């Protein structure tokens, strides 16, 4: 979605995740690099609205919300790889997202400096 949608950025993955929520599908594009199995039922369709939508493929921490759904993209525990450098992706290693499940309030915890990130 990021590579094929104008205005999307690898540094703001939550924006792409919100597009997936709007489309109600985890793989809304056909063809390209994402293989889609020819099954009788499309298992990538979001039939129910999730409370939390979590991903983390590109190693950049990002938090947002969309129509009551908490959107969380996890970072990583490693620094920038050569591939990420060629793609212009700057990961955010060592930052974990913790969610209070009673309130759905997210918090970032920076393990690089052992402090909470605003």
Segments the model singles out, each with a brief description of its role:
Residues 1-118:
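Extended recognition/assembly regions associated with phosphoester-bond processing machinery
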């Amino acid at each position: 979605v990021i590579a094929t949608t104008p205005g999307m950025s690898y540094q703001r993955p939550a924006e792409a995740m919100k597009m997936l929520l709007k489309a109600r599908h985890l793989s809304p594009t056909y063809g390209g690099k994402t293989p889609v199995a020819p099954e009788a039922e499309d298992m990538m369709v979001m039939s129910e609205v999730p409370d939390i939508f979590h991903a983390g493929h590109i190693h950049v921490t990002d938090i947002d919300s969309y129509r009551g759904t908490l959107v969380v993209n996890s970072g990583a525990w490693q620094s920038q790889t050569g591939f990420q450098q060629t793609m212009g992706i700057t990961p955010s290693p060592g930052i974990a997202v913790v969610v209070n499940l009673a309130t759905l309030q997210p918090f970032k915890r920076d393990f690089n400096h052992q402090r909470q990130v605003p």
